[in-house]
Regions:
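HDAC/HDAC-like amidohydrolase catalytic core signature
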Residues: 1-154
Length: 154
């Protein structure tokens, strides 16, 4: 089996430690421990170790965000330092950086799949990104990573 075929058949797991720095101001359901539990479970699964390829995400840029979000929403998130954006969604010191790498993971996953380098992809990102709308953060999500990835794939 060639190296290329070997990579394609692995589960490619996009992850970066920056995701753990997106921390709530107080106790919150969406917290680093959610991702830590996934990583711990993967470490314990000896049968999976040879089938997972850990990859680092790229960082999304403002143009990527603007492909699905309004300028006012992007600027609001980029200038907010700390606090709650709604009852469910918080932002803290490293949240913006984590969110940019979360969106970037989706872009890189799209590239890898389109170029037929990867077949199976899992983006273990924080903050999550599928509830945010064009104009606002919500449901724990600052940006809509799923929409950014889909738009990028077009």
């Amino acid at each position: 089996m060639s190296v290329e075929q070997n990579i394609i058949n692995k589960i490619c797991f996009f992850y970066d430690e920056i995701y753990l720095l997106h921390k709530p101001i107080d106790w919150h359901t969406e917290r680093p421990e959610r991702l830590i539990s996934i990583l711990t479970a993967l470490e314990e699964r000896v049968d999976l170790k040879d089938n997972i390829n850990f990859l680092k995400p790229d960082k999304a840029n403002e143009e990527d965000l603007l492909s699905v979000h309004s300028e006012s929403h992007v600027k609001n998130i980029m200038t907010k330092k700390s606090g709650y954006l709604d009852p469910d969604t918080y932002i803290s010191e490293h949240s913006l950086e984590a969110a940019l790498f979360a969106a970037g993971a989706l872009k890189r996953a799209v590239d890898e799949v389109k170029e037929r380098k990867l077949k199976y992809v899992f983006c273990a990102v924080r903050p999550p990104g599928h509830h945010a709308t064009k104009d606002r953060a919500m449901g724990f999500c600052l940006f809509n990573n799923a929409a950014i990835g889909a738009r990028y794939a077009q």
